[in-house]
């Protein structure tokens, strides 16, 4: 009996739906062929971001598959029908695919596109349908089936197995299916992509990001609420000018106030050890005010156990700027110590202001410095009160006590004040010395007088020495006058050449001065030493003021030879060969015409002018011989007088001259110290300038020596003695003829006036040319030429020696030497 079979078609989307009859062939369109959804006239709405990035779930997955199955239900039915008709073609395609070496995945895709059929019964209608199927156009069906299979790749299939019975007659069909069981793997490419995308999206918090995207307004800074903490105290003077100006300065506070406040909430600072030299932790600029109870409770704790402050490196900048740092710049071991120290300072600010500022071991800066603008005067005074600390870092680290530094500075200031208030009275050189304790010798005297301390006199005692002005050496220095002394009794300093000042007798200095019956003749008879006297201008003014009405004697020494000869002819004399004789004759004639008394005043002014010209030519030889000159002067004092005293001179003038000579000899013998000097052997051969002048310039000494000296019986006044104590005769003025030109200037003229000469065809250089070529000048030869020929060229009758020429050469920077002695 024939066995009946049943054909069951298993569909992936609708397994329960089995068609009762063969469906009619439907028309194919792009939606059916390619699996596309039908086009809608309006574009589909965009999904929201929340739905787009929603993580996949199983409920969502199956829901989406059900919707697709409903949309393409008709297409699946048609594909099932075509699959049953093309079963032989499917087997042929599988064989061809295995022959061409297709991949396993492509085989599975092809088998997925075919419908799975199992024949279970004997249904004649279905069998006839299977037999008639190959009779149709296979090629067209093949292409359609291939296209349909390719188009249906995106469909999900259910897994089906072999359900044929063992007694099946269709061995060829069932055997083929048995050899290659078809299994279905769901296509999850889209879900895998979604999982990969959502794996990183879960942590991005995109919901909050979308909210921020819709609202672009910046968020408010919540930290601004902390500004209200500055107004806790509620001071009434918050709007004063000092606070307004301080707002423009650098506050040195961190921008992150919230972090600082959190760090101090626990009531103690961090315990880590800072290694930075600059304070990194900054307290907020808030004035802490503690209640009295809390302050009283914390004060004993601090007294019992003082906080130990670790030694840290200090610098000059840190010490100087320590007074200007706010509360937050110093270290504090705890917040309680900081507030307690602050409370103590507030209570004792008025009493211990200076000690609080210099407290080195305090845990914090106890006072709040309000920056204020001071007026210029107050600012300058404030800067003067500041203490500047100088030293190396190691010294500052060892000497960390500010009180020691302050005490040291106070001691230094006190010692300086004592030195300036009470200057030390240095001992004088002798009991009768003219230097007094009140007299200040140095022009550039300083409060400490360091240079004066280093100076000593001949006895080894300290002496005040004047500071010389070497630039303007020609100017005559002068000591400041005492308040009770007259200009005549002023102490005389050393001259331009650097000699020690000559001191007068003690008896003359101790006598008091009285105003005066002082005659004009007393001042006219004697001339002071220009090097040791007040300036010549002052002397000239005194002479001119007293004898302004008297005519002045002409300066015949400055006249030329022709002028002198004319003046001599006016008085009825013949022209003379010697210039010196003409000058003497003219002076005598003028004195006889105008009177001897008037001539004395003019003679005094004339000597001052003559000596002013000779002052610049001072030499080192004169400096060495100063002591010898003073000794010679004390032994042979000579009074200055006219070469020839006219009969008209009064007897009173003669008596004064004799008295002056006696008094000067007594004063010089009592005041000069006979100092023995060890001179070189060469210097012994050189005569002193005073001897040279005595040798060559005294032509009227015999006449002056023959004059009798009349001594007056009437004693002179005390004022006269006091004024004579400071009057010293110059060796040059005592022996030199008034009105004579300087011998050094005459030598200069003679050297330049020498004519060039040549002997035996060889040119001999003149003395001037030798000097210009820096040839050594033999002093003996030079003196011989000047005495025989040179000085005669300039009408000079005086003679010079080798010693005087040596001084002249040294003063002018000329190379000179003596002739060698072959002994």
From Swiss-Prot:
It comes from the Eukaryota. It is found in: Nucleus. One of its GO terms (molecular function) is 5'-flap endonuclease activity. The keyword Phosphoprotein applies. GO terms for biological process: DNA recombination; DNA repair; DNA replication. Pfam families: Slx4. Forms a heterodimer with slx1. This is Structure-specific endonuclease subunit slx4. It comes from Aspergillus clavatus (strain ATCC 1007 / CBS 513.65 / DSM 816 / NCTC 3887 / NRRL 1 / QM 1276 / 107).
């Amino acid at each position: 009996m024939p066995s009946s079979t049943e054909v069951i078609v298993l569909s992936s989307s609708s397994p329960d739906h089995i068609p009762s009859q063969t469906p009619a062939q439907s028309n194919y369109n792009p939606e059916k062929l390619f699996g596309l959804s039908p086009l809608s006239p309006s574009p589909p709405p965009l999904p929201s971001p929340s739905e787009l990035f929603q993580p996949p779930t199983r409920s969502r997955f199956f829901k989406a598959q059900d919707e697709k199955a409903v949309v393409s239900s008709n297409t699946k039915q048609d594909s099932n029908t075509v699959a049953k008709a093309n079963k032989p073609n499917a087997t042929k395609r599988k064989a061809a695919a295995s022959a061409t070496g297709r991949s396993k995945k492509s085989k599975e895709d092809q088998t997925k596109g075919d419908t799975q059929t199992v024949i279970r019964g004997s249904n004649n209608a279905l069998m006839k349908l299977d037999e008639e199927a190959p009779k149709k156009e296979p090629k067209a069906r093949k292409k359609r089936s291939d296209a349909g299979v390719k188009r249906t790749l995106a469909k999900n299939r259910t897994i089906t197995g072999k359900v044929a019975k063992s007694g099946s007659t269709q061995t060829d069909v069932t055997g083929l299916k048995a050899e290659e069981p078809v299994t279905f793997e769901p296509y999850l490419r889209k879900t895998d992509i979604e999982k990969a995308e959502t794996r990183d999206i879960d942590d991005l918090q995109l919901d909050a990001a979308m909210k921020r995207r819709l609202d672009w307004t910046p968020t408010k800074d919540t930290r601004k609420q902390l500004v209200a903490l500055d107004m806790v105290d509620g001071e009434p003077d918050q709007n004063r000018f000092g606070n307004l100006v301080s707002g423009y300065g650098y506050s040195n506070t961190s921008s992150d106030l919230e972090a600082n406040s959190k760090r101090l909430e626990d009531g103690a600072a961090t315990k880590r050890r800072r290694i930075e030299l600059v304070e990194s932790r900054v307290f907020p600029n808030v004035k802490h005010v503690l209640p009295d109870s809390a302050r009283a409770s914390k004060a004993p704790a601090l007294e019992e156990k003082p906080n130990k402050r670790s030694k840290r490196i200090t610098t000059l900048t840190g010490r100087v700027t320590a007074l200007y740092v706010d509360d937050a710049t110093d270290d504090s071991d705890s917040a309680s110590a900081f507030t307690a120290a602050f409370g103590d300072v507030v209570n004792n600010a008025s009493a211990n202001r200076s000690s609080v500022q210099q407290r080195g071991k305090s845990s914090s800066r106890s006072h709040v410095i309000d920056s204020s603008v001071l007026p210029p005067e107050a600012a300058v005074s404030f800067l003067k009160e500041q203490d500047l600390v100088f030293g190396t870092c190691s010294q500052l680290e060892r000497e960390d006590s500010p009180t020691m530094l302050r005490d040291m500075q106070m001691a230094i200031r006190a010692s300086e004040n004592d030195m300036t208030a009470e200057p030390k009275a240095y001992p004088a050189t002798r009991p009768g010395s003219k230097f007094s304790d009140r007299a200040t010798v140095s022009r550039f005297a300083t409060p400490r007088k360091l240079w004066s301390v280093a100076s000593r006199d001949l006895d080894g005692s300290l002496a005040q020495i004047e500071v010389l002005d070497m630039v303007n050496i020609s100017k005559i220095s002068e000591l400041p006058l005492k308040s009770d002394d007259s200009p005549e009794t002023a102490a005389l300093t050393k001259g331009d050449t650097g000699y020690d000042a000559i001191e007068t007798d003690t008896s003359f200095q101790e006598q008091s001065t009285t105003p005066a019956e002082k005659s004009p003749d007393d001042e006219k008879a004697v001339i002071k030493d220009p090097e040791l006297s007040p300036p010549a201008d002052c002397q000239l003014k005194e002479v001119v003021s007293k004898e302004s009405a008297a005519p002045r004697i002409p300066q015949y020494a400055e006249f030329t030879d022709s002028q002198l000869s004319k003046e001599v002819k006016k008085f009825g004399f013949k022209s003379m060969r010697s210039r010196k004789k003409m000058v003497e004759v003219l002076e005598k004639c003028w004195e006889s015409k105008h009177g001897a008394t008037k001539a004395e005043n003019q003679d005094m002014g004339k000597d001052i002018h003559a000596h002013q010209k000779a002052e610049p030519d001072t030499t080192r030889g004169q400096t060495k011989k100063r002591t010898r000159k003073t000794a010679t002067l004390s032994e042979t004092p000579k009074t200055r007088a006219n070469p020839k005293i006219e009969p008209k001179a009064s007897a009173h003038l003669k008596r004064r001259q004799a008295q002056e000579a006696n008094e000067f000899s007594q004063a010089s013998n009592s005041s000069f110290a006979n100092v023995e000097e060890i001179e070189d052997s060469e210097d012994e051969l050189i005569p002193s300038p005073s001897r040279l002048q005595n040798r060559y310039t005294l032509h009227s000494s015999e006449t002056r020596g023959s004059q009798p000296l009349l001594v007056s019986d009437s004693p002179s006044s005390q004022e006269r003695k006091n004024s004579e104590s400071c009057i010293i005769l110059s060796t040059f003025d005592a022996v030199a003829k008034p009105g004579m030109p300087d011998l050094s200037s005459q030598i200069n003229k003679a050297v330049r006036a020498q004519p060039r000469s040549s002997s035996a065809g060889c040119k001999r250089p003149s003395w001037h040319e030798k000097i210009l070529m820096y040839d050594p000048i033999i002093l003996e030869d030079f003196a011989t030429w000047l005495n025989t020929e040179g000085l005669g060229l300039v009408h000079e009758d005086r003679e010079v020696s080798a010693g005087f020429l040596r001084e002249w050469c040294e003063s002018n920077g000329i190379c000179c030497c003596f002739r060698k002695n072959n002994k």
